[in-house]
Curated annotation (Swiss-Prot):
HAMAP family, alphabetized: Ribosomal_uL18_B (MF_01337_B)
Keywords per UniProt: Ribonucleoprotein, Ribosomal protein, RNA-binding, rRNA-binding
Name of protein: Large ribosomal subunit protein uL18
Signal peptide per UniProt: none
Functional note: This is one of the proteins that bind and probably mediate the attachment of the 5S RNA into the large ribosomal subunit, where it forms part of the central protuberance.
Species the sequence originates in: Helicobacter hepaticus (strain ATCC 51449 / 3B1)
């Protein structure tokens, strides 16, 4: 891709991130689940925005799982168990500017299957 196309894609991602982030807010009873995906790994964390603390997190790198749909499902299963240990059953999903497709969608769907209400 040309440099101009890459800059445009990055700008659109930042605009999506700011637009969605302005509308959602995590509380202690309903934290925000923020996802991040790199070229190799997938990460997620539950955040209480009132206090600015992370309540639960999962790291695909520590689990040795790469960034694909099957691994995102395993990461979501691990994350759901850590949320249940923290007695969290309802969350707000922050896709962090990523399109709701592929790995992000597989992660969210698996969280729903594990009884976490998004």
């Amino acid at each position: 891709m040309t440099d101009k196309v890459l800059k445009r894609k990055q700008l659109l991602k930042v605009k999506r991130k700011l637009r969605t982030r302005g509308k959602i807010f995590g509380r202690a009873d309903k934290p925000r689940v923020s996802v991040f995906k790199s070229n190799k790994y997938f990460y997620a964390q539950a955040i209480n925005d009132e206090l600015g603390v992370t309540l639960a997190s999962v790291d695909g790198k520590k689990l040795g799982l790469g960034n694909n749909k099957e691994n995102a499902k395993q990461i979501a299963n691990e994350f759901a168990t850590s949320l249940k240990k923290a007695k969290i059953t309802e969350v707000v999903f922050d896709r962090n500017g990523y399109l709701y497709h592929g790995v992000v969608a597989a992660f969210a769907d698996t969280l729903r299957e594990n009884g976490i209400k998004l």
